[in-house]
């Protein structure tokens, strides 16, 4: 029995399913989840001392790679001054100033402790600002596990094959209108009929929870136009894409300005952090300035601010994102070449330093239906073959992959060598 197998058996005694987030259980790929004990640079090391090139990156935050010395040093220094104060700090203000300078749409920002908190709070704020109840989201897009958003969500909910979660009252779900991603005509039709009841449209500008589906040409532009026409707040959920697709996130990359944005993952440098913000007029409705209540004991805690500030400063250097994107492109090109050579139907998607892998004969992946038509069974086999070759991919056919600045030519070669063997075995 491996050390991971023993630990998983032990974990299941007191942790539901043996994990603290469902996708970690390997249910969609089979087998025993790996238990990691160390991570450094582009690598993770499991409890049986096997090293893997890591394309999960703690589900996105580790854009600098694991254990960047400057980030660790900033956290150590803050540790000497205490863990949390429950009071304002200079670092909170510095973080707010930096985020607002990087993301042009952000005129004001509020720190929270997770991406779920950020999206939940942004939607409450949009409802309070507009006085409307309904929200529009898109099929296969995941915005955290708050009740009103677990309707036809993506990620682990796709893996489980259910459209929503038990325990969500029907009265909550009735205010959530779910439309097809990348279908602006459906948005136009819905808003023409019920636009006066809709508080906000929330969208992942790159859908990262049905693997990685970039926006179709004109889709984000159409959302902006329709929201302006009907007085609807446009929210970009940039928990995944923020500071990764480009320094300014997907909104910077695609040139679309939302009214509100949510961030997580990278903004905390690996610590539990989220934030939401946007137009001053809307943010002025949040307590203590306005009637929309939001609070959190650990919001803006100094350890997270230290890690996040250091990370954002490091990734702001000129050329950082171009280097990341180039590695990702070279890796995906290499995978495609090896799949083609083996005669395996395979297509990749990319948005900066995030990517999707699909076992599909389609020319491109644009819709939820395209995603669901891909061969999840073949992905299972590929996942384990890549593990055998020392490469750790997301353990789900519906999760995006992530690269870091720590990935280089050595890691690229390990990845492509493992893939060549894997594709050959999948013929």
Curated annotation (Swiss-Prot):
Alphabetized UniProt keyword annotations: Cytoplasm, Isomerase, Porphyrin biosynthesis, Pyridoxal phosphate
The keyword Isomerase belongs to this UniProt entry's keyword annotation: yes
Highest taxon above the source species: Bacteria
GO BP: protoporphyrinogen IX biosynthetic process
Residues with N6-(pyridoxal phosphate)lysine modification: 265
Cofactor: pyridoxal 5'-phosphate
Subcellular location per the Swiss-Prot or TrEMBL entry: Cytoplasm
EC number(s) recorded for this UniProt protein: 5.4.3.8
Record has ATP-binding as a keyword: no
A molecular-function term among this protein's GO annotations: glutamate-1-semialdehyde 2,1-aminomutase activity
Recorded metabolic or biological pathway in which this protein acts: Porphyrin-containing compound metabolism; protoporphyrin-IX biosynthesis; 5-aminolevulinate from L-glutamyl-tRNA(Glu): step 2/2
Catalytic activity as recorded in UniProt: (S)-4-amino-5-oxopentanoate = 5-aminolevulinate
Entry's Gene Ontology cellular component terms: cytoplasm
UniProt subunit comment: Homodimer.
Entry's family note: Belongs to the class-III pyridoxal-phosphate-dependent aminotransferase family. HemL subfamily.
Cross-referenced HAMAP family: HemL_aminotrans_3 (MF_00375)
Protein name as it appears in the record: Glutamate-1-semialdehyde 2,1-aminomutase
Lineage summary: Bacteria, Pseudomonadati, Pseudomonadota, Gammaproteobacteria, Pseudomonadales
Gene name of this polypeptide: hemL
